[in-house]
Amino acid sequence: FVLNPVHLFHDYVIGEVKSSFNDIFYRGPDLKLDLSVISQEFGLGPGANIECESYDFFTKLYNSTLTRTDDRLYRLYRCAIVDLPLVLDAELNRSAYRGNSIVSGSRLSFVPKTSDISRSICTEPTLNMLFQKGIGSFLEHELQRKFKIDLTKQPVLNRKLALLGSIDGSFGTIDLSSASDSISINLVKALIPDYAFRWLMLTRSPCTTLPSGEVLRLDMISSMGNAFTFPLQTLIFSSLVTACYRILGIPLVYGKDGPQNFAVFGDDIIVRKDAYSFVVDCLTLFGFSVNESKSFNAGYFRESCGGDFWKGHNIRGVYLKELSHVSHVYSAINRLIRWSARSGTMLPKTVRRLFGYIGKTHRWFIPYTDGDTEGIKVPLEFFLSTRDSYWDYLLTRRDVPSRIKKSIVKSRTHPHSRSLKANTVDYLSSTVKPKSYAIPPDDKQECGLPGFHYNGSGLLHSMLGGFIRNGRITLRLNEANRTNVRLRSTSSWNWTPA
């Protein structure tokens, strides 16, 4: 890929985008991105890493072979932790038992996107991911500093502008085809300073292994699975949109929550109607392909960040991926009821059928403030009219666990301090708990965690980081899930979150 400007305005856009990235990566003559900055934000994602037997933090960093694509990454890692005695001791222990490994790159796999389409994702080597997370955190910080975009809140702002655009046509929404796969190495090299480009090249995976075993060289800077992919593409598109605005003479408007007249979240882009055509033209210049079937600048429909809007109404449907666990059924019922309330379309037969999938001893009614997967959300008046008779029924059942019966008795005879407050209501709710393993007191006992080797310093560091709680190593939420019912209280049952 080569940037090939067709007219003078293209040159202006390229210059503005480069200027934005210079501001991001330089502080005057000083470099902003270095090992000290990256190491402060070292981290690992919730997914898998190459040659790791489990998904938890302790296993990946202190109980597995440390994989990387370049030996310089391990030397940099040792430099970063040399002044951290606890981490260094944990690494020396791990290295002596598990060793290190250089791999060619990532491993490609697929996860379902729809019933017909799967999304590709790459499993990264552990050390590559550690550095990618550090770089990604730096990019997120700069994204918020320069463009006031907070990735944790931006989807709400995207939907807000999409809603407004569906009412008065003032904003258009742009969807890109395979955006992350279209960020080529040459594009990034042309836009960002050389020293920052070298950091990205060092930490990325140069190739990936297909399910067939074939090794494929990657010409994109990073894939989905790389921790800096999402903030990097958000920065590129934010820089491009703001450059287009400046050239068109459109003022950039910012509020306390972020930008008010444009929005970027990954490849979800929203711009003013009068800037739409120029932004699309510049996206093509940068090598991106606009998905015209999902991009809208005319009519009353707008789509962004999971919101489908028509004339100011959210017409997004409810998608049910699975109903294999009772928590999935709770979620389906709650989302369908919300959709019915929003659309005015009643679905009594559908909801009644889903309700029938829930066992008679698992029908927990909960307030609107709780999560969709914890029970069925109902008005307070309905809950109070059914609670006593349902709890009496549970007390008579032999198949109801004793801890649930004790919770009912506790609520009725020995209310805890919060229940003594006026208008406070006790109720039972279901939470899904992932499988966890108790840490043995010494290295002479087994843990049960696959491939577990006792590493005292690694366990302590994991505990201090919040990855070990109550002496147990917890796996991902979707691994060996089990349900835990607990007694809770609320004084704001009917309050509906915004």
Question: What are the roles of these predicted feature ranges?
Answer:
Residues F1-S118, S343-A498:
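C-terminal, non-catalytic extensions of nucleic-acid polymerases
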Residues E91-S95, P125, M129-K133, R145, ...:
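Nucleotide/phosphate-binding sheet-loop regions of phosphoryl- and nucleotidyl-transfer enzymes
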Residues D116, T126-N128, S137, S177-A179, ...:
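Short, glycine-/Ser/Thr-/acidic-enriched flexible segments
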Residues R119-I121, F131-Q132, D181-S184, P231-L232, ...:
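Short helix/loop capping segments that flank catalytic or ligand/cofactor-binding pockets
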Residues C122-I174:
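Active-site-proximal segment of RNA-dependent polymerases
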Residues R145-F147, V290-K294, G317:
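Acidic/polar loop patches that form or flank catalytic/metal-binding clefts of enzymes
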Residues S166-F265, I270-F286, S293-D308, G344-G375:
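Conserved polymerase palm-domain catalytic core
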Residues A298-R342:
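A conserved non-catalytic segment of reverse transcriptases
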